[in-house]
């Protein structure tokens, strides 16, 4: 038998998440295509600057999704309806509160973001118009992260697909109507996203209500779920946010150091990063599945189930990582030709293609172990692991003056390897001492 029960359970959750992840860049492509057809490049520049500011802020707040998944999966495994309700309501209160604060302080936040980015006045003006509307979606966007994490934690496999696909399709339709039809330009693109986010929130709440009813969570439980000690949730979110900040800084450094190597290197790295991002979407699907299943095992204090999850994840995601490495080694040149038609960039990209073969095999373990640690809500250890990896990344950047762009890709490989290795050592120590469930 090719797949055992644990393998199938993993794929049931991983496959919808992989499919959902693929819809995310599709939305970006449509945004670019729609805005790119307007009569001035400043519109596209404004949306690009605005999207960068939003992406940075919301990536820092991604802890809302991750912590919610871990806490929910543990409550699900423990079969505790009150904890299940609290795992939804407390993060929702936090998300809505943070979203309202972003709306209230959006003007100074916009001023700060545009001051940091800089650029032409015309582009910054369009970015300002975009952000003034786009950040009105903050409560819905952050609440959607919580709902996505909670529905993933209860292993409702179809929910992420429905939420992301419906939200993105609605966004695309509204983009076309508001930008191209009503000629609202960047304000139309922002309004389309805001509307789609609130529509997604309504759908997500309906799904959550259905699960809560099936699990016997009463209205009285929900009303009281926001009470109770939030210190664990706040500490967990703090640690994951610091981890996310280090991750953002390291990937930002790749862009900064690449820019110093010349415009051709920036362009080539953008092409190669597209390939790496696609790989990450697939491997992230397994990480999400591991979060839910390992969290369930943690909540049930079931060591044998946890080992089953881990072995299945290693088998299945390991094979997927090897498949990506094989495809990139055999057909990488053809893929690059699809991504850029410039012969000079194609030739330059071929020099660094070897890293696309190496990185999936090196990086898969840190994705899986992230999932294990999120499921166990061990945020402090994830933060410390990321700090070790970031230090290794920084030291390896010293090779850039000698190795050039190979030094940048080596730094990324070291970063991924150290994340996986440090988490593996922590996991091994806990398992040997019998302290993983403590």
Identify the role of each PLM range:
Residues 29, 38-41, 75-78, 153-154, ...:
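Helix-loop interface residues and adjacent transmembrane-helix termini in multi-pass membrane transporters
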Residues 18-70, 134-141, 231-296, 317-324, ...:
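Transmembrane helix-bundle signature of multi-pass secondary active exporters and lipid flippases
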